[in-house]
Amino acid sequence: MNKIKNLKNSTILYLSLIILLSLTFTFYSGYRGIFPIDSFLIFDAGFKILNGYQPFKDYWSITGPFLDYFQYLFFKMFGVNWTSYVLHAGTINIILSLTTFYFFLNIGLKKIHSCIYSISIAILGYPSVGTPFMDHHATIFSLLSLMTLILALKKDYYYYWFSLPLLLGFSFFSKQIPSAYLSILFLITILIYLAIKKFRKISNVIYLFYGFVSLILICSSIIIINDIPIKNILTQYIFYPISIGKERSLYLNFNFNNIFSQFKFIYFSLLPLIFPIYYLIKIKVKKYQNLIDILILFTFLLSVIIFLYSQLMTKNQILIFFIIPFCLGMTHYYIINYCKNKKLIFLLLFLIIISTLKFHIRFNIDKKFMELSGVDFSLAQPGQILDQK
């Protein structure tokens, strides 16, 4: 009885710590400098909806209607002020961090390790920008959808299948990529999964369809209630971004720095996977769980490639370094299940500490994502000079 009580208390302690750090780092970053266009983009959109304007109908919108409506809700509940704006980002950061903790616990990592990876994500996730931003929302919800798919493949619970289309939809309506690419990959993964199960137990996958229908109903309700023309949505959110994407893809620079150097810590986090992959290949008679783990491994690695490609397509500062803790956590899972080398676990923990410190300094303190590197923050003026809110 005391053991159960201690377990509950330790879980509550971990969850409280993750929530506290998720909010603290986001608020620290959100109040540390602004970049006029990017910092106020979603603020303005949420304020427009609060005043009766609708995206696509009353103002041009090529990215982020999900953010616009979500920010509207925060303004409605907490008032039009910077605190409710940063709280929006902090809330998403909490969701990401807590889901990461839950995910790693459910695939078999210890609480302390799950907590370490979750805290790292809490520090490197939304704090890199500090205020709501479409690229962060899109990448975060895409990462959440990847976690959900992995849990669905391992646990086969209906609520994971149901949630998957919703999370992909939230990501897509934050920004079109990476969810558009991930949807294709996930569909292929699900078909292979069904083939492994010989199409016998597909009842839970039906909930995937229910989730998709629910997403369609939510979107349709918003469109009908607000009388938003479908033609405007297609023009602004589908056709125009496709034309931009085609042009950008033609001029992508696949040099060493773009492909390898700037993402080296992501590759470092994946490098130890060589050992469990070797052991997986050596297994002559692969059991059902081995096949599922192989499927998850390839889906995970291809998803990382999609995240990298999407980052290159944004032509923006790098934001995906918060997938490093996730990559290390996945590597951790395969090591303890197929390699069982404690030295490699210490290597992973060393990498998580180094990468978290490095990118916390670069993005949260120096604010590189907001183009504020080298700025003397001692000369900063309080925002109340412009507006008390």
Question: Where are these predicted regions, by residue range?
Answer:
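Hydrophobic alpha-helical membrane-interfacial segments at the cytosolic entry of transmembrane helices
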Residues: 13-21, 199-225, 266, 342-355
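Short acidic/glycine- and proline-prone juxtamembrane loop motifs at membrane-interface regions
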Residues: 130-138
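Membrane-interface alpha helices of multi-pass inner-membrane proteins
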Residues: 160-178, 182-187, 301-312
